[in-house]
């Protein structure tokens, strides 16, 4: 396409110059032998057309940067040792490891001790300990093993004897007085309950019916201080 454009531009240049119809060689007319004519002016035009050439633009040089190479080798070292005792009963092992790089540093240490407990067992030393005194110490007071009770106070207590009287309604006045009841000597300070007996009223039907007083009954009971009495 570029070559056609160059040819078209050259043809256009020829047309503008007016040289397309000009003869390639200049002609001379021979004059008569007698007459002399001045030499006509000869105009010579030379056109040197260089061969067309196509100029190609140089390709664009694209430079790619080489990748950044980081040369950072890591250096590692490890060490291990095992020390055993006579017979191999006990072993002590050491292990260490070191890794060094451009960005980090690591250290590791490991120590292990093993013992198979195969040593000779010594006889136990006979140690005589005195037998502990069998003494039972109790913080609480031991109960006294004895029967303890407040014995009734044998003392004469003048308690009022219960009034035992027979009462009849509008009957012939017959008063029966009972003898004093035996005084019960106890350790109870309260008065003995008064027990009063009342005879049933005498219903007199006729005068022929005789009247006899009811028997005097006295009941006494006491309960307290672990004792109970009744009669």
Curated annotation (Swiss-Prot):
Please list the GO terms describing molecular function. Answer: structural constituent of cuticle
Q: Which cysteines are joined by disulfide bonds?
A: none
Q: This chain belongs to which protein, by name?
A: Cuticle protein LPCP-23
Q: Which gene encodes it?
A: LPCP-23
Ranges: sequence repeats: 130-133, 199-202
The domain of life is Eukaryota
State what this protein does. Answer: Component of the cuticle of Tenebrio molitor.
**Signal sequence interval, chain numbering:** 1-17
Q: Which InterPro entries match?
A: Cuticle_C1
Q: What is the taxonomic lineage of the source species?
A: Eukaryota, Metazoa, Ecdysozoa, Arthropoda, Hexapoda
Which Pfam family is an annotated match for this chain, by its short name? Cuticle_3
Keywords carried by this UniProt record: Cuticle, Repeat, Signal
What's the domain remark here?
A: The tetrapeptide (A-A-P-[AV]) repeats found throughout the protein are also present in many proteins constituting the protective envelope of other species.
